[in-house]
Amino acid sequence: MIRGFFFKFFFYSGFVLICIIFLPALIMPSNIASFGGKLSGYWAKFCLRIFLSTKIIVKGLENIDRSSKFFIACTHQSQFETFFLQTIFESPFFILKKELIRIRIFGSFLKKIGCIEITRNKISKDNVDFYERVKLSIDKKNSPLIIFPQGTRYDVKERPDFKKGASRIYNLNIKCLPVVLNSGSVWPKKGVMKSNKKLIISILKPFEIGLDGNVFLKSLQNKMYEELDKIS
């Protein structure tokens, strides 16, 4: 518990400092703000190592084809992946709930790197053309979109069904790269942080375009949970 307290104190203090240092990036090219995000990811890794003795292992880097356009479907157990994935992928952007955009300063950085907001569980004018905006953003940017098909953070042992949004993005003729993490075993959504653990990021082989949307979604969920069972 004490180690977790020190981790959170130093990590969030450092994160706030990074945000302050990179404030000028809000009026500069977006890649400057993206670099601030990457720096936050490395800071998270450093703090986990120093305060919780966490060993971070990344598997499957050979499955990343940086010459093609793709979106990333990632399991979501912790805040960790929102920071650390920015160290693996070049200037990624996210789909996120509208409430996050409204957070002062932090929301401005999210908008700057091209994050796409959605109003969850509600039909709105913004949601009607949502997937068109996703397609335009992916075509325009030379960086991947990251989504969390579970919809929100879940406990390590939970296996909720994936949301249909993943298949709708896949049906835009964009291949999908699955990424599986056991981050909740170290940095859970709720409860005490764990020390002396291995935090594994497993990058699976991509799903090429051409599958039926429902077939894709079922196969994606099965493969990701199968891998999650292995590394948990």
Language-model segments: residues:
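Conserved H-X4-D acyltransferase segment
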Residues: 2-6, 10, 43-96
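Catalytic core of membrane glycerolipid acyltransferases/transacylases, capturing the structured
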Residues: 15, 19-38, 66-123
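Hydrophobic alpha-helical transmembrane segments in multi-pass membrane proteins
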Residues: 15-19, 50, 145
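Structural element of the ATP-grasp superfamily
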Residues: 47-48, 85, 110, 169-170, ...
